[in-house]
Amino acid sequence: MTNELLYEGKAKRLFKTDEAGVLRVAYKDDATALNGVRKESFAGKGELNNQITSLIFSYLAKEGISSHFIRAISETEQLVKEVSIIPLEVVVRNVMAGSLAKRLGKEEGEEIPNAIVEFYYKDDALDDPFINDDHVLYLDIATTNEMDTIRQAARSINKVLQELFNQMNITLIDFKLEFGRDAAGNILLADEISPDTCRLWDKETNQKLDKDVFRRNIGNLTDVYTEVLNRLKQVQN
């Protein structure tokens, strides 16, 4: 297996493999906040996110939602289909929290009757600005048809994930998705779905079970990620 590094991000490394069109993702133990300004390492975090993402992507596949995920190959690694990442962060919001609550002057915890889908331009130098469809077209990020596909996929994924997390006694507050194009131009779900990319609250206590415990210094990150993984395993057994 080749060790040629293609890309290193805040939470993962991407490597070539000996198979054309297949890449290896290695999850890191690093946690970042404020767009990478704050950074710490937590032993076992990479393993937890790899397992959680692998289980969720496998579950989505059974529900008819395609992604780049192929299979996990170690505690911290998985194989994925090679895609060209579309530089958009697609955020789906079911409950008021975080930046949306501040932007709209709302209280955290207020339910949103119909999920809000937002788009952010993936550019660290610009601090990932909030953009709309017109900006996407102007920047030549995606076509109108591709945006329709992405928005529909995001809502479908939201429905499936809400049902899954409900079984885990967790409220899916909001989450971030990324998509890519495969060699044939098909739009596929990519990146990861984990407590790094989701805002998750316990249904009974509203305890935060995601990276907010790190952002806000209100808990042990590996403990809450382990709790999410354990609940996920229970509902999938």
UniProtKB/Swiss-Prot annotation:
GO terms for molecular function: ATP binding; phosphoribosylaminoimidazolesuccinocarboxamide synthase activity. HAMAP family: SAICAR_synth. GO terms for biological process: 'de novo' IMP biosynthetic process; cobalamin biosynthetic process. Signal peptide: none annotated. It is an enzyme of class 6 (ligase). It holds the Pfam family SAICAR_synt. CDD domains: SAICAR_synt_PurC. Keywords: ATP-binding, Ligase, Nucleotide-binding, Purine biosynthesis. Its EC number is 6.3.2.6. It catalyses: 5-amino-1-(5-phospho-D-ribosyl)imidazole-4-carboxylate + L-aspartate + ATP = (2S)-2-[5-amino-1-(5-phospho-beta-D-ribosyl)imidazole-4-carboxamido]succinate + ADP + phosphate + 2 H(+). Belongs to the SAICAR synthetase family. This is Phosphoribosylaminoimidazole-succinocarboxamide synthase. The keyword Ion transport does not apply. The gene is purC. Pathway: Purine metabolism; IMP biosynthesis via de novo pathway; 5-amino-1-(5-phospho-D-ribosyl)imidazole-4-carboxamide from 5-amino-1-(5-phospho-D-ribosyl)imidazole-4-carboxylate: step 1/2.
